Amino acid sequence: MERTFIAIKPDGVQRGLVGSIIQRLESRGYQLVGLKLVQVSQELAEAHYAEHRERPFFPGLVKFITSGPVVAMVWQGKGVIAAARKLIGKTNPLDAEPGTIRGDFGIDIGRNLVHGSDGPETAQREIALWFQESELVNWTPATQSWIYE
C-alpha cells in the first residue's frame, strides 16, 4: 500500500486547523498510520529542506518550520501521494482551488499550512527522516472493504 508524509506546519497548528486537515484525509478514505506532535530541530529542518539549501528562501523555510510545533503524519492508501497533493492544493494559497486545504484556509505562500510528499521517493525519504519504523502502526480499518475492491 502506498504511503505519504504529511506535515501540518506551525501556522496550521497555531490556527487550530489540525482536526479539519486530518478529517479531509480520513473522509477521503485514507488511513493514518503515524502521527506525532514535534518541535522541529534545526537539524531536522535542514535535512527536510535539503534540496532547497542553495535557494535564497532556505533560511526562511528553516526558521518558519522551527518556529512552533508541527504535526507529522504518515498516511497510506491507493494513490495517496497524488490524492493528498490535490487535497492540499497549489503551493501559493492564492492560486489554490477552492475546496483544497490551501484554497480554503491559506492566504500567504510563506504560511501555506501543510506539506505533502511530491512523489514515492520523496515520501520514503521524508517518512524515514521523521519517523522510526516502530512509530508506524499497521492496522486494518473496519471500513476497508467499503473503500477498496
Swiss-Prot record:
Keywords: ATP-binding, Cytoplasm, Kinase, Magnesium, Metal-binding, Nucleotide metabolism, Nucleotide-binding, Phosphoprotein, Transferase. Pathway: Purine metabolism. GO terms for cellular component: cytoplasm. It is an enzyme of class 2 (transferase). Its main location: cytoplasm. InterPro entries: NDK-like_dom, NDK-like_dom_sf, Nucleoside_diP_kinase, Nucleoside_diP_kinase_AS. Its cofactor is Mg(2+). Homotetramer. This is Nucleoside diphosphate kinase. It comes from Synechococcus sp. (strain JA-3-3Ab). The lineage of its organism: Bacteria, Bacillati, Cyanobacteriota, Cyanophyceae, Synechococcales.
